[in-house]
Amino acid sequence: MNTATGFIVLLVLATILGGIEAGESHMRKDAMGRVRRQYCVPVDQPCSLNTQPCCDDATCTQERNENGHTVYYCRA
């Protein structure tokens, strides 16, 4: 086997192994996403509109704090 053929074989092997690893990583990420989605923010705790939902049918509502800043809290 000459150098060019060996290089091509290694390139194909690396591509196959890289694809397998990417697939496994994607599956792990999905499993972690399910775990994270099961978590909810307790009532009367700060929340974000783009992250976990509030627990106990509460909603993430916008309020003003004592400094006049806009904050979000889970309120029932």
Curated annotation (Swiss-Prot):
Gene Ontology cellular-component terms listed: extracellular region
Main location as per UniProt: secreted
Keywords tagged on the record: Cleavage on pair of basic residues, Disulfide bond, Ion channel impairing toxin, Knottin, Secreted, Signal, Toxin
InterPro entries: Omega-atracotox
Subcellular location field: Secreted
Domain of life: Eukaryota
GO biological process, one term: defense response
Tissues where the protein occurs: Expressed by the venom gland.
Record GO terms (molecular function): calcium channel inhibitor activity; toxin activity
Entry annotated with the keyword Flavoprotein: no
Cysteines engaged in disulfide bonds, as pairs: C40-C55, C47-C60, C54-C74
Pfam families from the UniProt entry: Omega-toxin (PF06357)
UniProt key word Cytoplasm: no
Annotated signal peptide: 1-22
Propeptide boundaries: 23-35
Domains as described in the record: The presence of a 'disulfide through disulfide knot' structurally defines this protein as a knottin.
Record's function text: Toxin that may inhibit ion channels.
Family note: Belongs to the neurotoxin 08 (Shiva) family. 02 (omega/kappa toxin) subfamily.
The name this protein goes by in its record: Omega/Kappa-hexatoxin-Hv1h
